[in-house]
Structure formats: structure tokens, C-alpha cells
Amino acid sequence: MVVSGAPPALGGGCLGTFTSLLLLASTAILNAARIPVPPACGKPQQLNRVVGGEDSTDSEWPWIVSIQKNGTHHCAGSLLTSRWVITAAHCFKDNLNKPYLFSVLLGAWQLGNPGSRSQKVGVAWVEPHPVYSWKEGACADIALVRLERSIQFSERVLPICLPDASIHLPPNTHCWISGWGSIQDGVPLPHPQTLQKLKVPIIDSEVCSHLYWRGAGQGPITEDMLCAGYLEGERDACLGDSGGPLMCQVDGAWLLAGIISWGEGCAERNRPGVYISLSAHRSWVEKIVQGVQLRGRAQGGGALRAPSQGSGAAARS
């Protein structure tokens, strides 16, 4: 894509504002009841659409949840502990003070046939990031969802890990996204709504900033965002995938590298998916969520290696 002028530097002050607000985290949340000790994060017990995606296998991604509004799938999210789910803040726009409208379905592979081993839990409250502006494409599009009660862990319901400070994602690192979103713009996932998955490469942030640059004003790619996907389009996240995970495997454990946030259209050429980086917001999550598990490189300090081969299948809102 030919652009006019140079894109702005990545940033926009999002993380600077965020750092000053960390100390203002709600003491009510910090004093919440101690959670039960969970199983090891990021390790499915059973191993074996997203646009251009493919069916996942049952229990392949046991931390993925369906956030439902009035009983209908609305967004995806990821389980962190027995009482906390993480997702995109924009999923609750205009409804932040109406948690009774929402519920969380865990352990479901097919939304049309969730099965007796799935669990459905109400939402107690939602904690959006304090600097999120509620504007489309804004930085800090991340929220924590407090469940009304503790869930029961099983092979179908397990937590995902957050990346520790040793994790870095160089361009062309292959990770995965998953969700129950539309398979094309305006085409919902057909019954029985089987969870879709897609392998996506990380895209250099400067390249992504150029792709989304409009020639004036602040560029939309901020320092707390990651881009991933295929420049040719055809495979991507789509409506209904918002809030779902960008997952990378490190030393046998799956880490939540990012949260599906935004993009232009679905699977359009030169419009890759944009994700909120968990590395950028790890400290905020740790201030609120007691018992969240972090994982990194076994030897410490190393970046993830980009696989020599890849491709796969995809998810967004």
C-alpha cells in the first residue's frame, strides 16, 4: 500500500497514563476472597471460524469462553483463574453497569450443543482498563470480568498463562487465534457453531502502522498493540471473535499474548488483525487478579523463535 507521508511514532501516551493509574486499582478488588489453587495454566489435558479457519478439536483450547449477552454469543474471552476472565473492553460498551445482561459459557466446543459438561456463570462486575476511551481502535481495549461464583476446573475448563517479562514476539512468530465469530463479513458461523482456529504470524509493528496510516493525525497502532495475520487477506478474525485470545506456545505451555481487538473489515488485504498486548498490561492484570499464572522461557530472556514453516487457519469484532 502506498502511503502519503511518514506514519507517526508508535505510542500515543497510552502506557504512560496507565502507569500513573496502577496505584489507583480498586482496593475492593484487591481484597477479594482468595481463589482456590488452579491446575497448571496453558496445558490442555487433551491434545491431539474465524475467516478461513478450521474446526478446533474438543477441549483443545479449554480456557476459551463465550461471553453471552441476553443468552446469545457476543464476544470471546480467556479464563485466568476460577473467578476471572479477560476480554476486550469494547464488548461492554454502553453496558458496563449492566452485568446482569451477560453470562459466561465455559467448556463448550460447539455453542449449538454445549453439552452437560459445560458451565454457565453470571457476571458479577466488569473492570475495564482505566485509560480505555471507549472509542473504536483505542489503546487499552482490555477488561477483566469477575464471575459470580468459582467455576469447576476440568479437562474442558482450564486457565491460560500470561507471558512473563522474558517473552518477546519477533515478526513471523506463529501463534493461534480461536473463536466462534463470523466466517465472512455478515456471515455467522453455521450450526452447530464449532469453535474455529487459525494459525497467524506476528507482523512487525512498523509495517502494520504503515498499512493503517491515513496520512494525517495520530496513527492507530499504539505501543500496547500487536498485529498478526496475512497481508493477502482471506484469513482473519471477524465479528464475534472480539476479546478472544492470541495464543503462543512456549516450552509446552500456552500463553495469552494478545486479545482480539479490532481491524478494518474481515480478512481484507493489507488489513491484518490488531490485538492488545498482554505484556503491555501484565502489571495491571496482576494488581487485580489474585492467582494469575505467568510463564516464560525456561532459560529466561529469550525471544520466541519463528517457526520455519507455518500457515494455518482465523477470528475479531
Swiss-Prot record:
Keywords: Disulfide bond, Glycoprotein, Hydrolase, Protease, Secreted, Serine protease, Signal. It is an enzyme of class 3 (hydrolase). The keyword Transcription does not apply. One of its GO terms (biological process) is positive regulation of peptidase activity. Residues 1-32 form the signal peptide. SMART domains: Tryp_SPc. Coiled coil: none annotated. Disulfide bonds join 75-91, 175-248, 208-227, 238-266. GO terms for molecular function: peptidase activator activity; serine-type endopeptidase activity. The active site is at residues 90, 141, 242. Pfam families: Trypsin (PF00089). Expressed abundantly in the epithelial cells of the airways, including trachea, esophagus and fetal lung. Scarce in adult lung. Expressed at low levels in placenta, pancreas, prostate and thyroid gland. One of its GO terms (cellular component) is extracellular space. Glycans are attached at residue 70. Residues 50-290 form the Peptidase S1 domain. Preferentially cleaves the synthetic substrate H-D-Leu-Thr-Arg-pNA compared to tosyl-Gly-Pro-Arg-pNA. Belongs to the peptidase S1 family. This is Brain-specific serine protease 4. It comes from Homo sapiens.
